[in-house]
Amino acid sequence: MTEFIPAGTLYHALPSPFPMKRGGVLHQARVAYETWGTLAADRSNAILIVTGLSPNAHAAANQANPEPGWWEAMLGPGKPIDTARWFVVCVNSLGSCKGSTGPASVNPDTGAPYRLSFPDLSIEDVADAAADVVHALGIAQLACLIGNSMGGMTALALLLRHPGIARSHINISGSAQALPFSIAIRSLQREAIRLDPHWNGGHYDDVRYPESGMRMARKLGVITYRSALEWDGRFGRVRLDSEQAADDPFGLEFQVESYLEGHARRFVRFFDPNCYLYLSRSMDWFDLAEYVEERPVAGSAIDNARADARPASAKPQTGVSTADTVLAGLARIRIARALAIGANTDILFPVQQQEQIADGLRAGGADAQFIGLDSPQGHDAFLVDFARFGPAVSDFLQDC
């Protein structure tokens, strides 16, 4: 069980006990975060970034850690998210292995890693933990809440469960619910990990580690993070040189196979498998349509107590999830301005889901805009296609 924490990481201690949406509590839990820029005296210039499944809080270089971050081209002085103007906070998701408390963390009640004793994790838990960081920094209202990929889900949950926490919102390649295709892919990824004998019911170590399962899970993910258009343009049917090809008659032969293998091997030892399982499943469970019907969902006493403390519009409900109920759930969110952006080639979070977000927020009274970008790079476009995503984000923030 390993955590992978960047230098310069800051920590916020969550209330103890910290109740989880689906039952159970965390004791002495923490959230990892980093900051950029200077908070204005009136605390009106704060932006919060909530991330996808795998990133840490190190979105860009800063004084505490000058190493480039995972969103380096988007965040910094003079960049689309201009830290000469904005005070930016990026949090690592609760449940991760990159600083925030998760299955790889030590359970203070036992002195051993949580592993599978970690409570069921929901996107709402990730959102509530992020909101607690915002409040601890003395920020009453964010100028903008930015969420990408899984972070788009987290952002919507945050806005719904913590009304008034942000004046504006940018949702990048996110969604208001998990679609069947995405659920199916993630279920296969989790199955690949759990079928690796070294996973051993979550009890692995650095010597006996489910590397094969993690490698297969990552390959499946990478295939969905990009598009067929990009695969064709980058690799075609080009074969490896004879000295690069595997001797195994069913081994690596094409360049695209080699790319997937290399990408997977670079990932598998830098993300904890149990954390991967928990975060992956939290996305499958997320559905804003739960917040629409009138009859509350049955839950634990802790869950119900926490839900009772929130506005009625922010309590999960029962009912069949349809396009109409998702839109109705989105319409419960109160935000002044919003931008939903996606790539037209995204198969994991299809661009129609970002359009749905804009439609739903608009129904709730927001000045909401949708932009579908013609990027060939699929779901991961927001991480690489800065020529398209950068101006869209920059233009929106100009008026915040």
Swiss-Prot record:
The record marks R186 as: Important for acyl-CoA specificity. GO terms for biological process: cysteine biosynthetic process from serine; homoserine metabolic process; methionine biosynthetic process. SUPFAM superfamilies: alpha/beta-Hydrolases. Homodimer. It is found in: Cytoplasm. It comes from the Bacteria. The keyword Zinc does not apply. Pathway: Amino-acid biosynthesis; L-cysteine biosynthesis; L-cysteine from L-serine: step 1/2. Belongs to the AB hydrolase superfamily. MetX family. Keywords: Acyltransferase, Amino-acid biosynthesis, Cysteine biosynthesis, Cytoplasm, Transferase. InterPro entries: AB_hydrolase_1 (IPR000073), AB_hydrolase_fold (IPR029058), HAT_MetX-like (IPR008220). Residues 45-385 form the AB hydrolase-1 domain. This is Serine O-succinyltransferase. GO terms for cellular component: cytoplasm. Residues 52-55 are annotated as: Important for substrate specificity. Substrate binds at R218, D380. Transfers a succinyl group from succinyl-CoA to L-serine, forming succinyl-L-serine. The active site is at S149 (nucleophile), D346, H379. It catalyses: succinyl-CoA + L-serine = O-succinyl-L-serine + CoA. One of its GO terms (molecular function) is homoserine O-acetyltransferase activity. Its EC number is 2.3.1.-.
